[in-house]
A protein has these predicted regions:
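Short, ordered loop/turn segments at secondary-structure junctions
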Residues: 11-13, 32-35, 50-52, 59-61, ...
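General beta-strand structural signal in soluble alpha/beta enzymes
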Residues: 8, 28-31, 47, 56, ...
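Single conserved hydrophobic/aromatic residue that forms the stacking wall/gate
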Residues: 1-10, 270
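Conserved alpha/beta-domain cores
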Residues: 77-269
Length: 270
C-alpha cells in the first residue's frame, strides 16, 4: 500500500508521524478531525497541503487539476535533479554552502539525497516533544549516529534542545508565559535541568567519534551563559574520558545569533 497523503489528528507539526511524512514528500495536514471524514472512507479524496484543505467528492475538473499538479511537481523535481551535484555560487561568483534544516535523523537521508552539502541546523527539541519522558543518552546517540551515516563525512551542526516557551514539553514543569519567544527556554532552562543537558551533551560527544558533528547553543544572551555551557561541556568530556569512551576532542562549539543583546558581546567570542 503506497501512501499518497496523510491527515494527522495531532495539532503539532513536530509529531514524529508528520516529520516522517515530510521526509518522504507525503502531503500532510495536522489537526484533522478524522471522524468527520468517515462518510468518505474508501473513496478518493485530495489533500492540499498548500491550501490546508481536504477535498471530498471532487468533481471531474477538480480531479484533473490535482492530477495535473502532481505531474507538474514530479516534472519540476526531475528538472532540478541536474543541480544536485553542482556547486552553489552567487551571481558574482562567490561560493556558498547549501545546508539543510532537519528535526530528526530520518530527514537527513532526504536532505543529502537532494543535494545538501551539510546540515546547518539539527533542531533537537523535536526529539523531546510529543512523548511522556525525555529521551535517554543511548536513544539520542543512536539518532545522531543515524544522521551521521547519511552525512557520509559531511558536517552536521546540532542545536541543543530549545524547549520551553513556544515549544512546551508536558513532562517538564515550565510555566506558560505571555511572551514565550524571549522567555524561559533553551539555554535559560539548562541550569534547572542540568542532568537533561548533560545527557544531551554526552550523546553528541559520543556520536562525534563517528563523523563531523558541531554543537550550537540557542538563545545565548550573555558571556556568563557561554562560560557555564563550556564548563558543562568540559565536565561531560571528562566523564567520557574517565569511562574510556571515544569522542572528538576538538568538537566545535558555537552559538545561535537570535537574541539582540548578544551583539554587544560578539566581539568577545573571537
Amino acid at each position: 500500500l503506497q501512501s499518497r497523503g496523510l491527515g494527522d489528528v495531532y495539532k503539532r507539526q513536530t509529531s514524529h508521524t508528520v516529520i516522517l511524512a515530510r521526509s518522504f514528500n507525503i502531503p500532510t495536514l495536522v489537526g484533522v478531525d478524522i471522524a468527520a471524514l468517515t462518510p468518505w472512507q474508501h473513496q478518493t479524496i485530495y489533500i492540499d497541503g498548500n491550501a490546508g484543505a481536504i477535498v471530498v467528492e471532487p468533481g471531474e475538473s477538480v480531479a484533473r487539476y490535482y492530477q495535473q499538479e502532481a505531474r507538474v511537481q514530479d516534472a519540476l523535481r526531475e528538472q532540478q535533479r541536474v543541480w544536485l551535484t553542482q556547486q552553489a555560487r552567487t551571481a558574482d561568483g562567490i561560493r556558498i554552502e547549501i545546508a539543510a534544516n532537519i528535526a530528526h535523523s530520518v530527514e537527513a537521508q532526504a536532505a543529502f539525497g537532494n543535494g545538501a552539502e551539510g546540515v546547518g541546523l539539527f533542531r533537537t527539541e523535536m526529539l523531546y516533544m510529543d512523548r511522556t519522558s525525555a529521551p535517554g543518552e543511548s536513544e539520542l546517540y543512536n539518532i545522531f549516529c543515524q544522521a551521521l551515516e547519511s552525512a557520509n563525512g559531511r558536517s552536521i551542526i546540532v542545536r541543543t534542545m530549545d524547549i520551553g516557551g513556544d515549544k512546551p514539553v508536558d513532562y517538564l514543569n515550565i510555566p506558560a508565559e505571555a511572551n514565550p519567544f524571549l522567555g524561559y527556554r533553551a539555554v535559560r532552562i539548562y541550569e534547572e535541568y542540568a542532568s537533561l543537558f548533560t545527557t544531551q551533551l554526552r550523546s553528541i560527544l559520543r556520536a562525534s567519534a563517528h563523523g563531523s558533528l558541531k554543537i550550537m547553543i540557542p538563545m545565548i544572551s550573555s558571556m556568563e551563559e557561554i562560560l557555564w555551557v563550556k564548563e558543562k561541556l568540559a565536565e561531560a568530556k571528562q566523564q567520557l574520558r574517565n569511562e574510556h569512551i571515544p569522542f572528538d576532542e576538538k568538537i566545535q562549539l558555537g552559538i545561535m545569533l537570535e537574541v539582540p543583546s548578544v551583539m554587544f558581546i560578539i566581539c568577545l567570542l573571537y
